[in-house]
């Protein structure tokens, strides 16, 4: 499937339906912020990335890595692609780029969302060949079982398979088990059954931080060869 056929892999700016220009203002701020920073890690994605920055665990785990947070609420894969093609990677040379996006790709199939994520990985590989890419798996959503939850699960399976054996990209299923045995998700973990609470962010961020440290150590020749996380 080519980018022309797949709307999820066609770089597209957000339509400013509210008329206040906030999305473009954030994009310009990210480009400006990158000009005088030397991050080891860059996070890019939707509100799950954006809101992480407000949690204490960000300051505990990721600030020491001089991490930049380029998350914008509501973004889909096509919006992240546009941002990356328009300056957000130009002035930095991170060692790792963390990508967490796809749950907002409403109206796109699991295959299309996967194509969008693969396009992001390819673009980062082209623009930042020294960097590894870590793709975080999409989380379950909704208090009760629903089609979007199933679609996110399918995306994760497809992305995991697509990145298997990739020399510079890694898939991490960061879900610690948010779905309970009765099929429900607790508001203690996801306060609106989509966005993570501080409690919900903790296991996700600790699993990610562990992987980031392993990757950074491996690139510095201090670690054993990385084994991909088991399905």
Curated annotation (Swiss-Prot):
Cellular component, GO annotation: 1-alkyl-2-acetylglycerophosphocholine esterase complex; cytoplasm; cytosol; membrane
Enzyme class: hydrolase
Positions bearing Phosphoserine: 2
Cell location: Cytoplasm
Annotated active site: 47, 192, 195
Keywords recorded for this protein, A-Z: Acetylation, Cytoplasm, Hydrolase, Lipid degradation, Lipid metabolism, Phosphoprotein
Residue(s) carrying N-acetylserine: 2
Activity regulation remarks: Beta subunit (PAFAH1B1) inhibits the acetylhydrolase activity of the alpha1/alpha1 catalytic homodimer.
Subunit structure as annotated in this protein's UniProt entry: Forms a catalytic dimer which is either homodimer (alpha1/alpha1 homodimer) or heterodimer with PAFAH1B2 (alpha1/alpha2 heterodimer). Component of the cytosolic (PAF-AH (I)) heterotetrameric enzyme, which is composed of PAFAH1B1 (beta), PAFAH1B2 (alpha2) and PAFAH1B3 (alpha1) subunits. The catalytic activity of the enzyme resides in the alpha1 (PAFAH1B3) and alpha2 (PAFAH1B2) subunits, whereas the beta subunit (PAFAH1B1) has regulatory activity. Trimer formation is not essential for the catalytic activity. Interacts with VLDLR; this interaction may modulate the Reelin pathway.
Name of protein: Platelet-activating factor acetylhydrolase IB subunit alpha1
Organism, as annotated: Homo sapiens
Gene of this entry: PAFAH1B3
């Amino acid at each position: 499937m080519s980018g022309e056929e797949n709307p999820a892999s066609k770089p597209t700016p957000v339509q400013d339906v509210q008329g206040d220009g906030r999305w473009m203002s954030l994009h310009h701020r990210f480009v400006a912020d990158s000009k005088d920073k030397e991050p080891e890690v860059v996070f890019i994605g939707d509100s799950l990335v954006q809101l992480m920055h407000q949690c204490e665990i960000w300051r505990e785990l990721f600030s020491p890595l001089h991490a930049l947070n380029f998350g914008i609420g509501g973004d889909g894969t096509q919006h992240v692609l546009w941002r990356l093609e328009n300056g957000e990677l130009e002035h930095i040379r991170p060692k790792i780029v963390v990508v967490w996006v796809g749950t907002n790709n409403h109206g796109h199939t699991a295959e299309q969302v996967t194509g969008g994520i693969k396009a992001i990985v390819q673009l980062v590989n082209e623009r930042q060949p020294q960097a590894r890419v870590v793709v975080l798996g999409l989380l379950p959503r909704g208090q009760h079982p629903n089609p979007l939850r199933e679609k996110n699960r399918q995306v994760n399976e497809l992305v995991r398979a697509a990145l298997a054996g990739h020399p510079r990209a890694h898939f991490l299923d960061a879900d610690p088990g948010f779905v309970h045995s009765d099929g429900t998700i607790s508001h203690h973990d996801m306060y609106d059954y989509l966005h993570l609470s501080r409690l919900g962010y903790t296991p996700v961020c600790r699993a990610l931080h562990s992987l980031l440290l392993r990757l950074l150590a491996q690139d510095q020749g201090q670690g054993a060869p990385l084994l991909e996380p088991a399905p």
